[in-house]
Amino acid sequence: MTKAELVKELRIRTQASMSECIKALDASENDIEKAIVWLRENGAIKAANKLKNAATDGVVLAKKINNKAILIEVNCQTDFVAKNENFLAYANQILEEALAKVENKEDFDKLIINGKPIAESGLDLTAYIGEKIVFRRGEILKANDDQTLGVYTHNNNRVAAIILVDGKVEDEVVRNVAMHAAAMRPRYLNEKVVDKLWLAKEREIIVNQLEHEGKPAAFAAKIIDGRLNKILKENCLVDQSYFKQPELTIEKYLKNNNAVAVGYFSYEVGEGIEKAPQMSFADEVAAQMKK
């Protein structure tokens, strides 16, 4: 087997990172079995250093039980590890623990996973896999007896959403809205909760656009209001066109089912985290071999 093939085989068998596999093979004279032992012996020592790395991949998961819905994001460094069964088991363990213990957003940081605070709970897995593993964030929605919760996690675990509505409705209705929210990713539930600073920046952008377009000053105010209204409708969940029935807004779809949206959160893996440029597998191996 070539060195690249050995690296690939070792990575598949151990889920260790590319660089760690190369180091292990170099230290073991390209003997895969010895390299596996090397990884086990050296992993724990280097795990702490891995925590300095940027974890931009991972999964987002959503689930509800009784009157509680939980949304979490757990990060790793590559999509390869994001599909690893040990990583997925860890993420789901956090999800289940949150469903059992979390009552407000602050409780996420108090969770104990495998006997360790959640902030440290990924260290053992980091040592085993060779990538930074970390719980990033979580949200909770709770329903009273007259409300209904909806959750949706896409099958690739890359996007997910939770929603709370006033009214007792079928699970399919709220799941449809959660699915829509996960797909369309609106910034806000409705205009009442729109961030004023964000809105001011959007208005400023429109004003600058009009200056470049040379629009008549007499029509500027009307144009600004029109474009701003369009932006609000695109970014507020209740004002968006429902993807299954575009003639209806989400607000109208829920109203037709005797419900009103009152709470909403959605996550996408790695959003807001600066990502390094991606390399092909061959380029990554070549780069590591030069070190």
UniProtKB/Swiss-Prot annotation:
* Matches recorded under CDD domains: UBA_EF-Ts (cd14275)
* An example molecular function term from Gene Ontology annotations: translation elongation factor activity
Q: Where do the segments described as Involved in Mg(2+) ion dislocation from EF-Tu lie?
A: 78-81
Keyword line: Cytoplasm, Elongation factor, Protein biosynthesis
Record's subcellular location: Cytoplasm
Q: Which GO terms describe its cellular component?
A: cytoplasm
Where is it mainly found?
Answer: cytoplasm
InterPro entries given for it? EF-Ts_dimer_sf, Transl_elong_EFTs/EF1B, Transl_elong_EFTs/EF1B_dimer, Transl_elong_Ts_CS, UBA-like_sf
- Give the matching Pfam families: EF_TS
Per the record's keyword annotation, is Ubl conjugation included, yes or no?
A: no
Q: Report the SS bond pairs.
A: none
Q: Has keyword Cytoplasm?
A: yes
What family is it from? Belongs to the EF-Ts family.
Q: What does this protein do?
A: Associates with the EF-Tu.GDP complex and induces the exchange of GDP to GTP. It remains bound to the aminoacyl-tRNA.EF-Tu.GTP complex up to the GTP hydrolysis stage on the ribosome.
PANTHER family according to UniProt:
ELONGATION FACTOR TS, ELONGATION FACTOR TS, MITOCHONDRIAL
Its recorded name reads: Elongation factor Ts
Native source species: Ureaplasma parvum serovar 3 (strain ATCC 700970)
